[in-house]
Amino acid sequence: MTPDELRACEVIDALIRQNRSFALWRIPGESPRFAMQTSGFARLLYNIEELDGQSGFVIAPFHVSEQHPIVLIRPDIRELPLDKGEDVPCSGNKSFTLMEQKFHARETKVPCKGNLKEDYNRRFNSFIEPLRRKQFEKLVLSRSQTIPAGKADFSPAAAFHKAIRRYKYSYVYLCHTPATGTWLGCTPEIILSGEKGEWHTVALAGTQPLQNGELPTEWDDKNREEQEYVAFYIRKQLQALGIKPTETAPAPVRAGELSHLKSDFSFPLPDNKKLGDLLERLHPTPAVCGLPKEETYRFIRENEGYDRSYYSGFIGWLAPEGKRDLYVNLRCMNILADAFVLYAGGGILASSETESEWLETEAKMQTMMHLILDF
């Protein structure tokens, strides 16, 4: 890394130790952006529709609850303070010097174990049965895995910089708030982006490894069917709002060492104040939940066996009068004081097989694992 990048890492890691609310993110093809709130606390919301008209960096969970609210960072600083010893204002007209603070790790209970393969197999069996009975069309089964921190000098900021170099086609972010803790992710899936009435979302599903570093040209029926479920759902939700989108045919896209099928949807949304309504309709999409939505949403929460927290929620920048870029929170991890909690999932159809689905989650976790093992 360059001297400026090393200095930026020192500052960002210090902000995490100081329990500050901030976000650092990189949209594919653009430069990293930074936002930090030093006045007051990040806003906590308990309904997606409350995001109408809001501005800031949003961190939304899979399921909104008292334990996992929607968190909105309302920044008053948009440039990372890089001068050594620079004072950054705090609430109450106080200030602190970045390089003089003592380490205060966030108090977080480390899960005693991740979901082992045997547990995954049991969950898979409970998910496949209602699919074979045709109670549901699709379900998404996910799992977490807790990796003890091997070294005390792991730098979340350095991992972010490695991620933006390694995963140039993904949305990469690092964020921290007292309510959420520290999260790092590299996600390929837009849930909603756009400005000035022109909007974009995607139907992204189906997974294959790259073939000799290239996008695969052959896709089986299971992967195509899985992607079409997502496309159908998005089409239906937009049409329910009177929106007629322009849609592209499914095509393979790259996400790290994996590939997915993606359709793009472009559409007008004259009333930007209704973005919260649209997000409420889109989230969670069948790419992270299932069909039919409400029934599978409830089934997953009751039967998956763990709390997804902010994994498979959505994350990104909101600006009522400017550009918004919101992504589904995939290929991510929660960074604790002495461990990393990694998350991954995959779509299950009646034709799915346990071993291939397990291996898909293993492959997806490698996105974050590469960043951990580099230290």
Task: Spell out what each predicted region is.
Residues I59, Y171-H176, F314-I315:
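Short, conserved loop-to-beta-strand elements that form functional interface hotspots
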Residues L269-F375:
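Conserved hydrophobic core element of enzyme catalytic domains
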Residues Q18-V88:
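An N-terminal, globular interaction/scaffold subdomain
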Residues K134, L192, F232:
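Conserved hydrophobic/aromatic pocket- or pore-lining residues that grip, position, or stack substrates
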Residues L82-E118, F124, P148, V202-E302, ...:
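Contiguous alpha-helical scaffold segments within structured protein domains
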Residues V88-G181, T187, L204-Q208:
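Intrinsically disordered, low-complexity linker/loop segments enriched in Gly/Pro
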Residues A8-I12:
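Intrinsically disordered, low-complexity segments enriched in serine and arginine
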Residues N19-P32, M36, G150-Y229, G322-G345:
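An anion-binding catalytic pocket shared by soluble metabolic enzymes
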